[in-house]
Amino acid sequence: MKIERVSKRRLKIDIFLLIPILLISLIGIVALLSTTITIDGSFGDTSIITKQLIFLASGFILFFLFSFLDISILRMWQIVLPIYLVTVALLILVLIFGPVVNNVQRWLVVGGIQIQPSEIAKVTVILTTATVLSYKDRYNEWLLFFVSLLLTLPMVILIYMQPSGSMSILTLSIWFLVAFTGLNNQLRNSVILLIIGLITSAFLFITVTGNWYYILLSVVGLIFALFAFNYRDTWKIFVIGALVVSILLGSFSTILYSNILKEYQRGRIETFINPTQDTQDLGFNVNQARIAIGSGQIFGKGFGNGTQSKRNFLPEHQTDFIFASFAEEFGLVGSLFLLAMFGIIIIKGLIASINNVNNPFFAMLLVGITMKILLEVFINIGTNTGTIPATGIPLPLVSAGGSITVMTLFSLGLIQSIMNVSQKDKNKGKIIDNYEFIN
């Protein structure tokens, strides 16, 4: 089968998707440019700006290229399997040939260009999971659920071995959201998820804090379990399974925290619970970010006038903590504008997924890409504000970085392509069968 171009008559670029992308990219360049200004007001090394512009140009080429193509072919295993195998191979090569930077191996250097395969893996997980679950009309959905998990775990484990605990958790979370979307009976599944989440959280919080008051979480979980067990007979087996899984996950989380997580990873969790007791170590970064954000007040200090990054009080101000640097100079107004632009993209993605309810593959692909961006934004800003433990997740299209910039724009190109294909099929009055492009 050939990839067909969307007819020129119906080819459109949604300005409500494109404009926020362009504005966020511009904000990223402005924020990065500001970080190059020295204390005396002059520009320092601006090579990072040149690199980021190249990454953006490359990403926009992919965005427009895939916007113009009918990507229905991506549901074929002849396409998906090679993508999956190449991604796994890249993750293995990182552990063998990747340079060690700050005691981690997360990049491959090819022709002087650094590639971060874990960013590719996030998109591969979305594509693979959407493809597997699109067979749910032919096979048992729970069988497909676990097949998709088995395909995802090698990538998650390889990412964790770099080591990158936060990225491995993010990748697993993306898988779960896509797979969860692909299952039927969302009410039942949501209740089951709530039960597992509450009981597992109780195990983890008691382990970390030693405070047995968190057992109340498990009590609430058991109340929901009792309600669900008596709600419908068909739910009973799922409730029993949820309780078993909760105990297993809770026990595993305790073992994971106590015996598997590295000291710095445990430290991040403990610092998150009480960052003020660690202002000179792991909590220092978060507290400095909070100071930067708070000092920006309503309208900010103005371009190039931030003090936290200029005086090197704010670490990683071009990557992990660029939001704090931006908020210091552009204040609450600038921060809300940036969040609004991300919000428009996320809403567009979710609306598109609803419009593709008759095409499970497209719907799951849209949910996966949208949730990927939402999680990245939430985690990065949550780290900057101290809402969640410190991680190394950059802010898409804003933080400096080639892999995340290119893969984000590529993913957004897939959203635009699906919107074009969906509109074309809608105009034809056509309902797409899950397997139309498989055989």
What are the roles of these predicted feature ranges?
Residues 1-3, 380-439:
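A juxtamembrane structural motif centered on a specific transmembrane helix
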Residues 1-11, 42:
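Cytosolic juxtamembrane amphipathic/interface segments immediately preceding
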Residues 9-11, 145, 311, 357-358:
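Helix-boundary and loop/linker segments of multi-pass membrane transporters
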Residues 20-23, 29-31, 39-281, 328-383, ...:
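Hydrophobic alpha-helical transmembrane segments of multi-pass inner membrane proteins, especially
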Residues 134, 283-291, 295, 405-415:
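Hydrophobic alpha-helical transmembrane segments
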Residues 169, 173-187, 308-330, 398-406:
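Interfacial segments of multi-pass membrane proteins
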Residues 268-319, 330-334:
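TM-adjacent membrane-interface loops and short helices in multi-pass inner/ER membrane proteins
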